[in-house]
UniProtKB/Swiss-Prot annotation:
InterPro entries per UniProt: LolA/LolB/LppX, OM_lipoprot_LolB
Localization: Cell outer membrane
Chloroplast listed as a keyword: no
Gene giving rise to this polypeptide: lolB
Keywords, ordered alphabetically: Cell outer membrane, Chaperone, Lipoprotein, Membrane, Palmitate, Protein transport, Signal, Transport
NCBIfam families for this protein: lolB (TIGR00548)
Name the UniProt record assigns to this protein: Outer-membrane lipoprotein LolB
Similarity comment: family membership: Belongs to the LolB family.
Gene Ontology BP, a term: protein transport
Length: 207
């Protein structure tokens, strides 16, 4: 089904978010050089992951709307992933399944949409301009196409600045989950002008 030109999905707001505690380290002290071998090794370790999944809390805040939801992100192979957003009652508000050249999205009424661009699809259907193509790397603690970034004292990403298509995103990492190897982001915040996206990961399962 072709995409409509209007906002279709409005996610139910959550009054409160309950997060599962995990072992988190926060950035401390001066950052390390992006040219360091430790950073190159960390990137390689993350890229070597074939499958991973994480769940947690999602918030989108702008002058136009405020959305709070739970999310589940599962990567099953290269360029194959699944994203769920659920409301306070646990019902699915949005399910997105992506593979090379084909993206399918099902809304909370069971309506199915198809496209070849997940980022564009979510933006049109929800009114939230989420940089999904870049977020797939950022959520792993990788800079993606960004070249302007900083590391913390543990040779992990602490901040990213990235401009594309008129958007100027700044990504700040608030800590890492050290229960996984390699350590994975535990919370992060994306900002562009008056809009903010917050993600808090309860846990990671990596393979």
């Amino acid at each position: 089904m072709p995409l409509p030109d209007f906002r279709f999905i409005r996610l139910l707001p959550l009054a409160a978010l309950v997060l599962t505690a995990c072992s988190i380290t926060t950035p401390k002290g001066p950052g390390k050089s992006p040219d360091s071998p430790q950073w190159r090794q960390h990137q390689q370790d993350v890229r070597n992951l074939n499958q991973y999944q994480t769940r947690g809390a999602f918030a989108y805040i702008s002058d136009q709307q405020k959305v709070y939801a739970r999310f589940f992100w599962q990567q099953t192979g290269q360029d194959r992933y699944r994203l769920l957003l659920t409301n306070p009652l646990g019902s699915t508000e949005l399910e997105l399944n992506a593979q090379p050249g084909n993206v399918q999205l099902v809304d909370n009424k069971g309506q199915r949409y198809t496209s070849d661009d997940a980022e564009e699809m979510i933006g049109k259907l929800t009114g939230m301009p989420i940089p999904l193509n870049s977020l797939r790397q950022w959520i792993l603690g990788l800079p993606g196409d960004a070249t302007d970034y900083k590391l913390d004292d543990q040779y992990r990403l602490s901040e990213i600045t990235y401009s594309q298509n008129g958007k100027n995103w700044k990504v700040v990492y608030g800590g890492y989950d050290t229960k996984t190897q390699p350590a994975m982001p535990a919370n992060m915040e994306l900002t562009d002008g008056g809009q903010r996206i917050k993600l808090k990961m309860d846990n990671w399962i990596v393979k």
